[in-house]
């Protein structure tokens, strides 16, 4: 828990899935060059430099890009913006733990269809009447990625509601649903700088979608905060995006470590799904999870 973490001297927090590598050297360079005097001025409300850098990086128009204080902030605004029909929204029973928190906070009815025996989503659960859909892809904490065919089927079965695809871990999976944004008007893809770009401490997230959807999110956001992104976060975010070679190098290292870990876990008697993230959702054939948990606490 957060309370327990505050009470303990923790060097490595595996539960937050932080990146073990530092941010790009270009981020360090941008930090050194940052004009401290500029902090006396309010930042650009539209985060124009970061929006333009994201648009260039992902080959979309600037008015298709929304930026926020981490993907949690982006997702919360998306919930407020799109999920107000009174019909229940849908997301899996095992997924990112904040979806139901936001739904309850904003008084949005919701249902949580169970995953199948392989911890995958079942298409039929998302082909019923609903008020919107949220899919973490790859999913957390299972690490399992749904296919593009599955995503298309869900989107096409729900043309009148917004489908949010949360891609916090997509960079470790070799697949992104971003091309679907230009094919379907009801899709919003949410990503973060926290995982693959080693910038969890800066809190930078973004969404990409149809221009009307992004405008709607901005309209809601500006009613809460006219200056959501700091000058420093924008400058360092732009710097991170400028170093694609470093991003690809460190991401490849993490993927290689994941695959080695899978092999080692298999040899130790663990079973798990095909994780496409920077974590592995594993169980042991004979040793209970509680025993493993308590043993790890004792060791650390």
Features from the language model and the residues they span:
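A glycine-/small-polar-enriched, mobile loop at the entrance of the PLP active site in fold-type I
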Residues: 11-22, 28-52, 57
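PLP-dependent aminotransferase-like
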Residues: 81-136
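Active-site pre-lysine segment of PLP-dependent enzymes
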Residues: 120-129, 141-163, 167-199
């Amino acid at each position: 828990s957060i309370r327990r973490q505050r009470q303990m001297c923790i060097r490595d927090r595996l539960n937050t899935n932080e990146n073990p590598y530092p941010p790009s050297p270009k981020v360090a360079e941008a930090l050194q060059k940052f004009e401290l005097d500029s902090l006396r001025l309010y930042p650009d409300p539209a985060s124009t430099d970061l929006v333009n850098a994201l648009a260039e990086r992902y080959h979309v128009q600037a008015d298709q890009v929304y930026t926020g204080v981490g993907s949690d902030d982006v997702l919360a605004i998306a919930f407020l913006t799109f999920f107000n029909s009174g019909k229940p929204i849908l997301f899996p029973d095992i997924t990112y733990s904040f979806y139901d928190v936001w739904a309850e906070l904003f008084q949005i009815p919701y249902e949580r269809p169970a995953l199948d025996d392989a911890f995958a989503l079942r298409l039929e659960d998302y082909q019923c009447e609903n008020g919107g859909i949220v899919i973490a892809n790859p999913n957390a904490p299972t690490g399992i990625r749904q296919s593009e065919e599955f995503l298309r089927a869900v989107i096409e079965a729900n043309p009148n509601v917004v489908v949010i695809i949360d891609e916090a871990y997509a960079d470790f999976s070799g697949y992104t649903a971003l091309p679907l944004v230009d094919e379907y008007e009801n899709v919003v893809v949410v990503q973060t700088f926290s995982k693959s770009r080693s910038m969890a401490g800066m809190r930078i997230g973004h969404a990409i979608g149809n221009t009307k959807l992004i405008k709607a999110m901005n309209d809601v956001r500006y009613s809460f905060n006219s200056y959501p992104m700091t000058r420093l976060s924008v400058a360092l975010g732009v710097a991170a995006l400028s170093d694609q070679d470093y991003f690809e190098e460190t991401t490849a290292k993490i993927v290689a470590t994941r695959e080695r870990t899978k092999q080692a876990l298999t040899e130790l008697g663990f079973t798990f799904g095909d994780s496409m993230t920077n974590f592995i959702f594993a169980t042991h054939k004979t040793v209970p999870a509680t025993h493993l948990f308590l043993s790890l606490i004792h060791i650390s």
